[in-house]
C-alpha cells in the first residue's frame, strides 16, 4: 500500500498544500507554496471541480489549477484580473472607463459561457448593454478574496457535470470554514490590514471561529475603500483626449457566516450566509467621440448580493451509498447605476449628437436584478466488479432564476425650461428584455473505472439537461421589438463525455478526453430588444435561436521527477450554433426593425473553432529555490465568416524565480508577457492593436511566528507602459481613437498586507 502510494505521489503535478492520504501514511512531500502562478509541486493534491468529488490532481484527465489562501494573500490582487494575472490562458478584461473587471475568459471563451460558483452556488449573470453611453453593465461579483481558502479553475467544456453555462470552463471559489481559523484550537481568529497602490485602496478584515466537535461557527467581515485604478496617462483634461484615469471613490464591504453541525459521525449540516455590497462614484472626465454634445458626466453604481444555503452530508458506515450530499440555496443580486450628463449646444430634444442651441441635464438610470433558487443532490459509491474498481457518482441539479432589467431617464432642457421622460425616440421607463423566469434541471452520472491495479482509468459520463425560458408579458419591451411579442422557449440536451488516464510509469501520466458541451440561449439573446430612432440603430429579438453545442478533444502528459515537474496539454474545441450578435443586412433581412438604418441581432454561427497548447512546469534546482513557468497559445476562427475571434488573446507566458524557507519566509521575482496582437476581426472597424510586452513583479513574505505574517510586493518594477488586449477589445478601442494611453496598465506600484492570527 505504501509503495503504491509513493508511486502515485511521484506522478502528482499541482501546486497547493493539501495534505492527503499519502501524507497521512508517512510519505515524504516537498512543502512548496508558490507566490505567483498556480505552479506544480510534489504534493498529492486533492481537487474537487473536475469530477464533483475529491480526486488526486494527478488522476484527473483535464487541465485544472488551484490557488490557496496563502497564495492569494501574497499576490494581493484587487480584482479577478489580478487574481489570475499569472495564468496565461485566463483573461479578465477591465472596463477602464467605469465598471472595472467584468467576466472571466478561459481559452478564448468568456462571459456567461464560463461557470463561476461560490461554495457550489452559481454567481449572477454578466450583463453588458453596450453602447457609447456605457451606462448599463452588471458584473458577476466575485467573492471577497480574504474569505477564500481555495480557488479551482477547470479548463474546457464541463457540461457533462455542470450543464449549461460551463461550456468554456469552471471557476470554483471555496470560502473558509471554522477549522481554517481555529487550526485545531477551540477558538481562533484573524485580523488583516492591506494597502495597494494600484488604486490607493485600504482594506480591513476580521474573523473569529470556534466551537466543539459537535457545533462550530464562523463569522468574518471585510471592508475596503479605494480610488480609481492607475494607468500611464498624463492628460488630465475633461475631453475625448484625456488619458489619466477617471477619478473614482470605491467602497466595498462583505461578511460571511457559517454554522456547522456534526449531528453524528454520519450526519453533518452546514448553514452559510454571505453578503456583499459596494458603491462607486465616478467622474466621467474622458468623453466619448461618439457623443460630441456630452460635455460633462458622472456616474454612480450600487451593487449587492446575498446568498443563503443549507447543506447536508450523510456518510453511512455501509449501505447503497458511500456518501450523499445535498444543498438548497437562495441568492439575490442587484446592480443599479445612475449616470448624469450635461449636454451642451444640443438640439431641443437634448440629443447627444445633434448640434443646437440648448443646454440640458440628462439623468439615465439602469437596474439589473436576479433571484436564484435551487438545490443539488449527489450520491457517491465505490465498488469493485471483477478486477475493475468503480467510483460512481450521480445526481440532480435544479435552478430557477428570475431576471429583470430596466432603464429610466429624465431630461431637463435648461434653455426651454421643459422636463420630459423621452430621449432619442425612447419613452422611459423601458425594459431591454422582458422580466421572466429561467428553469434548468440536470441529471448526471459518471463512472470512474480503474483497471490494471489502478494504472489505467476510463471515465464515461453523461448529463441530461432541460431548460425553459418563460417571459412575462411586457409592453415596455413590445414597443421596442417592433410589435413582436416575447416568446417562451424550452429544449433538452444530452452531454456525454469520455476520458482516459494511463499511468505509463511511476513518473509519467498520459491522459485524453472527448467532451460535449452545451449552452442554452438566455433571456437577452432570445427576447432582448432596443431602438434608437434618432441615431437609426437598434437590436431585434430572435425567437429562433438554437442552443450552442461544442465538441472538445484534449490530450495531455504529466511528468514528475524528484526535482522537475511538468505538464503539457493540446486542445481542439469546436462550437456549433455559436451565439453572437451580428449586424443584419437591412432592409432586405426580414428581422430588421422598421425605420432604422442598422439592426443588430443574436444569431447562431455555423462553426467556431479554437485550438491551442499549454505548458506548465517547475524545477527545484537547489534546496529552497525553484523556477516555474507557464505558456499558453490559442488560435480561434469564426469558420462561417473566416474572421479571427477577437476573444482569443495572443500567445502569453509567465515565469518566476522563488526562494522560500519552510518556516514561512520567502521572496519571488515574477515575469509575465505577451506577443503583439496581430489577428483581429476588423470587419466593423479597425482595432487598436497593442504591442507585445514583458513586466516584472517582486514579492516578499515573512511569517514572524504563528501569529504574525507580512507580505510586500512591487508590481511592474521597471514602470513598463503596456496595454492588455482584453481591455482594448472590451471597450472597442479603434486605431484612430485619441488618447489610447487611457487604456494602459498601471505603472510601478507597491502593496502590503499584514495578517494577525490568534
Enumerate the language-model features and the residues they cover.
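Gram-negative outer-membrane beta-barrel transporters
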Residues: 34, 379, 451, 458, ...
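Acidic, small-polar-rich N-terminal luminal/periplasmic segments of exported/outer-membrane proteins
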Residues: 36-181, 555
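C-terminal beta-signal and adjacent terminal beta-strands/loops
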Residues: 126, 518, 574-576, 676-680, ...
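Outer-membrane beta-barrel translocator/receptor signature
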Residues: 130-134, 146-150, 155, 160-233, ...
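Transmembrane beta-barrel wall of Gram-negative outer-membrane proteins
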Residues: 197-226, 236-283, 304-306, 386, ...
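Membrane-embedded beta-barrel scaffold of Gram-negative outer-membrane proteins
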Residues: 227, 313-314, 322-341, 503, ...
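Outer-membrane beta-barrel domain signature, strongest for Gram-negative TonB-dependent receptors
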Residues: 244-402, 565-567
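Structural signature of Gram-negative outer-membrane beta-barrels, strongest in the C-terminal barrel
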Residues: 262-264, 391, 397, 431-574, ...
